[in-house]
């Protein structure tokens, strides 16, 4: 499954699909299509037909209040389908998809725009039936024509979608509310699933004219607020600075079981920052409400400000590994450029990274070294291959490195001066074999005499704390590594064009990998600009194993094929694995509230959270930092949007007395 924000987190397959007959009696099942209200890859559906809500939501969550969030970077388009430009964060609030995931089941989703999906036994096609009540924000119905238009334009305009949906060859209207997708291969178990992820856009709106009287063009970027069928609309924005989404009171799907207890904030505003440190200051100052931390030093040292001490800011570390898993974070050499096409060079670069020293000196020993492209999941390879994994590898034996059968992958271990010296000596040995030698204090090519130097391209100064010590280690073996942080637009454009020597990347994985693996590691993606094959991997063995992942017929087969793929990717030393923490580190002002139990496979943010000011029915402009009715002065603090505490006890008593909410 493709784990990127703009697409979602769904996955389907038939081998384990637990399904319900929606429209046909059992006697007619042989002749009529079987319509399924939900699909699951891993197990039976948790929720029965006609279920009322997801277990992890609060059906009584109050509606109201404002949520203020932050984002690093910028934006210059609201077009949800293009790869061009910097697409605005938050568009998932505007556009519905055919299916909606359940966050307490693995790779499971239920109908949103679609009331059901059907497909033949050989999975040569899939048909989605739209809900009759599904409407656009202008009141017009969502139609099969909209779905076909959305799919066709997504594949036409975005290389990522071209790869992801490459086995879907045609979409067509096949009924008043039905749209059928045709596949070029049979028994691809994930295709019905990933089709549920497409953002559906209104054909009539995009083929109409804009406020300037000119025809709209979906192939171009635009800052005209786009129309969708989702629970929010774009209410206002400042280009590159802020976006405010406003909840639609006329949203067609508000009462659907997959939406109960969700979409609770009246508005969601994103403020954009060019620097993560400045972004944190906005949170600390009370100008944004929620923070997810990704820097060990800040988590360990920066949360000592007054609002944390007096309880107005809550700080939580949520250890459930399924909320932070299957991640490969790495420095990525670009194999399209020499000498990074030499595996010995890439392996030498890994020996120069002293993770243990970094973990001790700047990470407060909070992190683990990543040692798998499917880190900390059942999909990760370990030890020597056996069983079905070994069978997969034997069947492509001539295409994979022989060491996958004899030597488990392991990262170099440092942490002491002696180990660091040993690792650097090993790096020099590998570089010598690759045609380099030390000439004085410089590593040079033995044939050309050219010094080995390269640029490490970063997107944020916060990564320099790792890259600069790494560059110093490389300098000890004569390599000049220049660390350069570029602005977000330049970073995005250079990544899309593969214009870098070494960069920093995080690949998120689902627990049900599939078509997206070809975009990450497949040969065709290596030359397709806009793909996520940042390393430039082009290897027939990897391609063969990707196909086995995609066409796995059941969970056991999928796990075995993925382990084999992981093992081969590691054996080629394509990347320099970095680190990760198997916990979610979050902080939030206590104007926010959430269900006591978060979903098993996510944080449910912001969908299932709500505003205490809505719960307390406070006057406009007043934000609630307590549960009304709690005892003690500290429990009765209220504050205004600029975080000035209201300490007038009489006023607080009046507010809480008028409130219908008693905590």
Curated annotation (Swiss-Prot):
Q: Which family does it belong to?
A: Belongs to the bacterial solute-binding protein 5 family.
One GO MF term, please? peptide transmembrane transporter activity
- Signal peptide positions (record): 1-29
Per its database record, what is this protein's job?
Answer: Possible binding-protein with either a transport or enzymatic activity.
- Provide the protein name: Uncharacterized protein y4wM
Pfam families linked: SBP_bac_5
Q: Where in the cell is it found?
A: Periplasm
One biological process GO term for this chain? Answer: microcin transport
For this UniProt entry, what is the primary localization, expressed as one broad class? periplasm
The alphabetical list of record keywords is:
Periplasm, Plasmid, Signal, Transport
Keyword check for Repressor, yes or no: no
Q: Does the keyword Signal apply?
A: yes
Provide the species name. Answer: Sinorhizobium fredii (strain NBRC 101917 / NGR234)
Organism's domain of life? Bacteria
Q: Name one GO cellular component term.
A: ATP-binding cassette (ABC) transporter complex
